[in-house]
Design a protein with these regions (language model features):
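Peripheral peptide segments
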Residues: 8, 13-17, 74, 83-84, ...
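A contiguous strand-loop segment
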Residues: 1-20, 48, 53
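Proteins synthesized as precursors that undergo proteolytic processing into mature forms
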Residues: 19-55, 163-178
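Aromatic- and glycine-enriched pocket-lining scaffold segments that form the walls
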Residues: 39, 43-80
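Aromatic/basic-lined ligand-recognition segments
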Residues: 75-84, 89-91
Length: 199
């Protein structure tokens, strides 16, 4: 599967170049999925691509996006930026909006202490500290609505989730993972008076 997410302020598309596959950002997903069954096949196509700044309609600006592409074995993130086209291995298999993927992935280092297990008292052997709630191994997991925090949260959720044995259990688990980063109407107001929401 493949998805494009908002990448405002970072996406840079080029003018068409001879000898390259000049693809508009709105054509990118069907162009890849129409020709590739695996991420490896997509890597071959991406070696010749030039994402161009063609608008879908003169009424709308070009959508600034970055993409995640995944098959059952691996995932990559694709970003067209000022320096060129960056293709990153995506070991967590998730993506949110800004910042660029390499920064999002690096930020996971700040949360290496998180665990699905109950924590052990390392504060002091002289104190008898109590575990007063389940889930305390994940204390410090970001809960705000910024893209960077949502990336950490969904990466932790996905990497530690356990699916059941049936298809319906796996589908249910998938939607629980997505729910960990859902935007609720009213919690993130935009400058134009509208709200950032998850549909």
């Amino acid at each position: 599967g493949m998805a494009g997410l908002n990448f405002a302020g970072n996406a840079v598309y080029r003018k068409p170049k001879e000898g390259r596959d000049n693809i508009a950002q709105f054509e990118f997903i069907p162009w890849i999925l129409g020709q590739c069954a695996t991420v490896q096949e997509a890597r071959t196509l991406l070696a010749h691509i030039n994402l161009v700044d063609t608008r879908f309609s003169e009424q709308f600006p070009t959508s600034q996006l970055h993409w995640i592409l995944a098959d059952r074995d691996e995932a990559i993130t694709i970003e067209a930026v000022e320096e060129g086209l960056n293709i990153y291995d995506n070991p967590v298999g998730v993506l949110t909006k800004n910042p660029p993927f390499d920064k999002q992935l690096f930020r996971l280092n700040d949360y290496s202490y998180l665990s699905p297990d109950q924590p052990v008292n390392r504060f002091s052997e002289q104190l008898q500290l109590q575990l007063y709630s389940r889930g305390m191994g994940a204390m410090g997991l970001p809960g705000d609505l910024s893209s960077a925090s949502r990336f950490v949260r969904v990466a932790f959720t996905k990497m530690n989730s356990v699916s059941g044995t049936s298809e319906s259990e796996s589908v249910s688990q998938f939607f629980h993972i997505l729910g960990s980063v859902a935007q609720t109407r009213g919690c993130c107001r935009l400058e134009n008076g509208k709200y950032e929401i998850t549909i």
